[in-house]
């Protein structure tokens, strides 16, 4: 009696995991057929045990929902702070603020704090919608999600304010933000796996903040990964947050 074969696929990305599983099964079938000297493919139902880890039903929504959450964070915590600053430039109220005795750091902080609060509220609502509408609940700790979300919100809001400091009109701000948002969506692993990209593109993703947050969300939601195991992602997001917020304060005029 032949030994049983166990095949386990990483099904976080349902499409990629399913295709990889089929390739492996077909390869095994052809190999067994050649070894037995048979013309028809061997029947693998009694020999092979197939297991899809992290996403047993191969539901593609489980892969996409975290990406949609991040896109929502970028639109709310990225677009709105930039438009707020540029809107005050166009209306002239920014000049009145500049003559007040507050420091640039306090002004930047006053612009960021409301969007930090809104962002954390959006995280809560997004998780509730994912649970109630799509039946997707995090396997890991919710604290890991909130910690990553806070760092990402700090990063994207500081990034948007930096862009606003170099923009003169709302139209200019929207065009620049749209360019970066499309780059984030296409190159950060939100919609397509980073592993399937060319080598140069994979290296380029290392400087894109959403890459690290989408790994946090998918790992916590589907794998149950802990905060300690995601420390490199948190460190990267914290570094981006520090750099962009310092740039936002230094470039403000």
Label the predicted regions.
Residues 5-23, 86-98, 119-127, 176-192:
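Hydrophobic alpha-helical transmembrane segments
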Residues 19, 76, 80, 89, ...:
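Transmembrane alpha-helix boundary/anchor motif
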Residues 3, 23, 81, 92-93, ...:
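Hydrophobic alpha-helical segments typical of transmembrane helices
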Residues 1-80:
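Transport-system extracytoplasmic interface segments
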Residues 137-253:
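Membrane-spanning alpha-helical segments of multipass transporters and channels
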Residues 28, 70-74, 82, 86, ...:
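Residue-level hotspots within pore-lining transmembrane alpha-helices
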Residues 51-132:
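Hydrophobic alpha-helical transmembrane segments of multi-pass membrane transport proteins
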Residues 24, 81, 85, 94-97, ...:
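Hydrophobic alpha-helical interface/terminus motif in multipass membrane transporters
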């Amino acid at each position: 009696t032949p030994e049983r074969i166990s095949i386990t696929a990483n099904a976080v990305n349902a499409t990629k995991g399913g295709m990889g599983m089929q390739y492996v099964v077909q390869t095994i079938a052809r190999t067994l057929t050649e070894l037995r000297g048979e013309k028809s493919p061997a029947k693998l139902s009694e020999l092979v045990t197939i297991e899809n880890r992290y996403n047993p039903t191969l539901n593609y929504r489980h892969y996409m929902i975290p990406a949609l959450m991040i896109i929502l964070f970028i639109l709310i915590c990225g677009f709105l702070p930039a438009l707020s600053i540029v809107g005050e430039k166009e209306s002239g109220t920014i000049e009145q603020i500049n003559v007040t005795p507050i420091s640039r750091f306090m002004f930047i902080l006053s612009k960021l704090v409301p969007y930090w609060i809104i962002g954390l509220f959006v995280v809560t609502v997004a998780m509730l919608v994912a649970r109630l509408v799509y039946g997707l609940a995090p396997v890991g700790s919710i604290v890991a999600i909130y910690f990553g979300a806070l760092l990402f919100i700090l990063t994207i809001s500081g990034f948007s304010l930096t862009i606003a400091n170099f923009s003169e009109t709302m139209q200019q701000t929207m065009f620049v933000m749209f360019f970066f948002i499309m780059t984030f969506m296409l190159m950060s692993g939100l919609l397509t796996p980073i592993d399937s990209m060319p080598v140069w593109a994979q290296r380029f993703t290392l400087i894109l903040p959403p890459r690290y947050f989408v790994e946090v969300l998918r790992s916590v939601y589907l794998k149950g990964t802990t905060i300690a195991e995601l420390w490199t992602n948190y460190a990267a997001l914290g570094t981006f947050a520090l750099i962009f917020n310092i740039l936002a304060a230094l470039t403000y005029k």
